[in-house]
Amino acid sequence: MILASLARYYSRLAAENDEMGNPKVPPYGFSEEKIGWILVLDKEGRLKTAVPNLTADKKPQPKLMSVPRPEKRTSGIKPNFLWDKTAYALGVEANKNKAEAKENPFTSSEKTFDAFKQYHLDLLQNSDDEGLQALCRFLKNWQPAHFATENLPAEMLDANIAFSLEKPTALIHKREAAQSLWAGCLKSDEALEGCA
C-alpha cells in the first residue's frame, strides 16, 4: 500500500513542471546530474565546439541536467549511456601528479574510453538516427591525444560531459531514438534482475 502511494505520488510529480518548465522529478530511468560541458558534433561526428554548461555564480558550477541514470561504479569499469566524465567519454583525466600537471595537464585513460566507445558502438550501430550516428562516428575517430590538438580547455578535465548535434541543435540523449533505446535498455536490465 505504501509503495503504491509512493508510485502515485511520483507520477503526479513527474507530470508537474517547476518554474523553469522542467518536470519536478526526472522520468523513470533518468537522474539529475551535474553536466559541466556539452560537446557539439556535426552530422559527420566531427567535434565543432565545446560549450560550458555552468552556472553564472561567482564560482561557476556545472548545471544539473536530466540524463540517463548513472551506472553504479563500486568497482570495475561501467560507462554511462550518452554522457560521462572525460575519463570515459574522451579517454582523458586530470594529471594527478602536480609536478607534471603544468606541462601535461591530462593523462590518458584508455581502458575507460575503450569501454565507453565499445558500449556505445554496440548499442548505437543499428540506429538510423543522425544524432546517434554522429556520436558513433565521433567515437570511432576520437583518440585521447585529440584533447590537446582540439584545444579543449583544461577546466573540462574530470567534468561530466554530454553530446549535442550541431544542426538541428539538440542534446543527443534527449532525441526520440535515444530515449527509445534507453527504455529498451532499462527493460532488459529489469528482466535480468528479475524485476520485469
Q: Where do the PLM segments sit?
A:
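Conserved phosphate-interacting/catalytic interface
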Residues: 1-196
